[in-house]
């Protein structure tokens, strides 16, 4: 709805032409500005501005629907509401089948914990034949930090799915379905994802991976406050792209040190603010996701990868379909493997805090375990 063209709404021709002349093309362009900003830019009176905004808002607002009609619509379109299997049984069961289509899924954790390994395994799964639990499609893998390894992907395939990868030519075919892009700047990345919207459906793309979004923004050498408007546009575009294309979009996020003022950024953490003050030694060692609270609200699924006392753990920290659960895992030649399919339910501040204790001795597996 936000991308609906103003020129196609039936707005009065005169005011519609003024919007077009000032390069305000979509409903989002108009509704992202204040009335005073529009009045100054378009050089028309407040009465006309308010009338136009009211018309555009009404034209783009979806009609009211009952819970019953939404359920019926979901049932009718169940084939569009699938999941990409992670081939980690406990995690797939928790997520009702795997990484869901049509939404943003975030992997957040310290360097070397296994985020890129997880992404490469997902890319492999998406390219696999349906008969073997895959999506039989292509993958676009935006490799910002040059961590993608074709050799590692093939190794994972040979170890995890030998019955498929030992077939003649299958390894080359699977690797050939993964298109790797390496943007050199945020501007280059922005241009690339804008071009993807039409090609995704035409080329049977079944997964988009961005590894990592944090690295793209940190390369701009701008303070965090100045990066937020840029991040806001990318959040909106990626959510729209996921919904439009009905594919899973997986984005990795790095971590930074948590300061004491951030302990109440989540509602449940506000309740333990006093506890935090009395226990700073424990909480000062925690990390938080680098992209901040606005990004955290934008993602539908958040998987936190952390290390406690030398043990890797993957947590389902945010999901509309399950309680917060934690699974211990390790990384082998086959990729990430759960040590137990029975997750431990989490409560309180442990859901979103990120540990990296005893982690430094685990980051050199195959030379790349990010």
From Swiss-Prot:
GO MF annotations, alphabetized: ATP binding; ATP hydrolysis activity; ATP-dependent DNA damage sensor activity; DNA binding; DNA strand exchange activity
Sequence similarity: Belongs to the RecA family. RAD51 subfamily.
SUPFAM superfamilies: C-terminal domain of RNA polymerase alpha subunit, P-loop containing nucleoside triphosphate hydrolases
Gene3D superfamilies: P-loop containing nucleotide triphosphate hydrolases
Tissues of expression: Preferentially expressed in flower buds and roots.
Lineage, broadest ranks: Eukaryota, Viridiplantae, Streptophyta, Embryophyta, Tracheophyta
Binding site for ATP: 109-116
Name of this chain's protein: DNA repair protein RAD51 homolog 2
